[in-house]
Every structure is written in structure tokens, then in C-alpha cells.
Amino acid sequence: MNKKYIQKNYINLCSKVLGTKIHRFSDQFFGSASRLLKEEQPIFKEGVYDKNGKWMDGWETRRKRIKGNDYVTIKLGLPGKINFAEIDTSYFNGNQPEYASIDACYFEKNKFNWVNILSKRKLNPNYLHGFKSQQNNKVFNFIRLNIYPDGGVARLKLLGNLDVSKLKFPNKKFDLLSILNGSKIVACSDEHFGRAENLLLPFKSKNMGNGWETKRRRGSGYDWVIIKLGKTGLIEKFNIETHFFKGNYPSYCSVQGFYSIKNIN
């Protein structure tokens, strides 16, 4: 996978920012399934143990003593089409699953009609695996990660796009730029220190890492970002926040807009 291309064109549908959460799991004896959804990179804490054994930054099940395999079911915060999957086994070495697969469905009318979007694949220890979805034209709101037979996975990302047609917009003023309303980054000049996608986050920044930051410009010109709105609308005002940016905020900014009848991605 071309990681730079994927980051520019797809969002992580497994992000807790979108409201994604763990629905159920077969086991989480050594590590909580909720750690799969963490935004931060996995870490390793030397010599740290909890009541069940070595603390690991990921979802880890106990050793399987019966037939079958472990799984975790995840409810996506917003429905979307899945193009790629990232299964990260960072720091799981000797306790990673031997194989993994992913199923997905669009849950409605109290029915889970699962389809396979990633066939059974071999997993390596301490490795970030990238896989292409086998069903990238269907909309899903639930996924199931299957691991064979047991073990630990640090992070799971499902990269794709929200299905804007299924989003519910309020009959009042709302943030047209929010990622929760289907907006996405189309292109930007630079994002050396902070991703442009952070501009679309629906919450107040916690620190400088939650913003868009470019490297220092040494030549002529200026930095820019192009954002595609999830829904057309009339813009009444802008809120431009530079919280936590003290010696590295822009001196000026400007905003332009246009209406396109073409599907720009």
C-alpha cells in the first residue's frame, strides 16, 4: 500500500473520534479490546505487569484450550465503505495470532448478515500489516476481527470513506467542516508536524498535536489546505483557533470556496 496516498484519501473508520466502540468480544484476559481503537502509536513498558501478567498495549486473549478462535466485534461510529485494513502487532512477538480475517455487515432490522472483507491472512510478529478490502463498494456499520487461534493485536484501522447519504444532518446550524458530517481533506501543501485532518476534529484541542502544522517555509509562497465538505451549505461564520500555537502560528489567513458539480477526491 502507498501509505501517503491512503492517508490523503481515506479516513480511519475505526476511530473513536467518529464514535466507534467495542460491541462484544470472545476474551480479553491479558489486554482490553478497547486498546485496538487507540489513536496513539503502541508502546512497550519494560517490566510492567498487572494482575493477569505482562501489560501489553493492545487486545490480548488467553491461550486457547478449546477448538475455535477469538474475535472482537466493533460498531463503527458512522457507516462507510472500507478500502484497506491495517492490523498492527507491534510488540507482540511470540504471542501474536497466527492468522486473522475480517467480516463486516450493515446491521439493520436486528440482523447481522456478515460478509467476508478480508480472507484469512498470515500475521507476523511485531509488524504493521496492510491489506486491501475484498468488498470496497458496500457500506458497513459493524465489523468483526477474527484471530486464529488466539493472541494479541495492538491496533486495528479500517481505512475508507463515510457514506454521506446515510448521515443525518440537523435542521439547524452545524459545523460543515466536521469529520462527523462527512468532510475530508482533498490536498494540502504540507503537514510535516501535524496532519491537516486534525482541522476537522469535532472537539477542542488538547495540545498542539491536535492541530495542523507545516514545516517552516524558507521560500516564497504560503501553505494551504483544500477541504471537501460532506454537505453543501451556506457559511455564516468561521472559527479559526490557534490554541497552543504560540511561536508557530500563522500571521494571517484567508478562506476561499467554490461549488463543484464533480466528485472530487
Protein language model features and the residues they cover:
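Flexible, active-site-proximal loop/turn residues at the rims of small-molecule/cofactor binding pockets
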Residues: 91, 149, 162, 244
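Mid-sequence acidic-hydrophobic segments that form the walls
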Residues: 105, 148, 159
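Short beta-strand-plus-loop segments that form exposed binding edges in beta-rich domains
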Residues: 144-152
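A cross-kingdom feature marking solvent-exposed beta-strand/loop segments within repeated
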Residues: 54-74, 82-91, 95-145, 209-227, ...
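Disordered, acidic Ser/Thr/Pro-rich linker "stalks" and the adjacent N-terminal cap
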Residues: 1-71, 75, 159-230, 246-248
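Eukaryotic regulatory low-complexity N-terminal regions enriched in Ser/Thr, Pro, acidic
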Residues: 133-137, 153-159
